[in-house]
Amino acid sequence: MKKNILKLRRIKYTDLSSDWVRWLNDKVVTKYSEKRFKRHTIKSQKDFLRDKLKSKSSLLFGIFFSDKHLGNVELSDISQIHKHCEIRYFIGKKDYWNKGIGAKSINKALNVAFNKLKLKKIYAFTYSNNLASQKVLKKNGFNIEGKMDNFFQYKN
């Protein structure tokens, strides 16, 4: 079996590592992520994983290349009633940025969403200045449907 192939597989507790936590605390990696607003620890990620692995409305995949965990792709807010979900993703290992891995990983996740879950619509959110993410989405057939100006979020 070839080791140098890109794999997407469901995340397991054993995938949790100090590298993963380091990625989440790296301001460059999380520049466009809501994860950037808090400090992450192994404990906080164990709690996060516990919730994700129990969830009926989310599928969290690890991105692996040469058996190295590079990042994650999540199909979240899955609605079988409305046949849609959101896709979220990140590559934590910066050495693998700009190599097409993000685009290929999203493609694999879309295959699961459309062919296994039988969803009809997948959506993603990205910042207008996150050109790399927009490029990855466009490569996978996404179109801009709208722009949220003056977006505010209530923080309790």
Where are the regions that the model predicts?
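Acyl-donor (CoA/ACP) binding surface of acyl/acetyltransferases
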Residues: 1-16, 26, 60, 64-156
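Hydrophobic pocket/interface hotspot
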Residues: 19-20, 29, 45, 87
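Short Gly/aromatic-enriched secondary-structure transition segments
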Residues: 22-24
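Conserved GNAT-fold acetyl-CoA-binding loop/helix
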Residues: 29-49
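Short, P/G- and charge-enriched loop/turn segments at secondary-structure junctions
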Residues: 48-51, 75
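Short loop/turn motifs at secondary-structure junctions and domain boundaries
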Residues: 51-57, 142
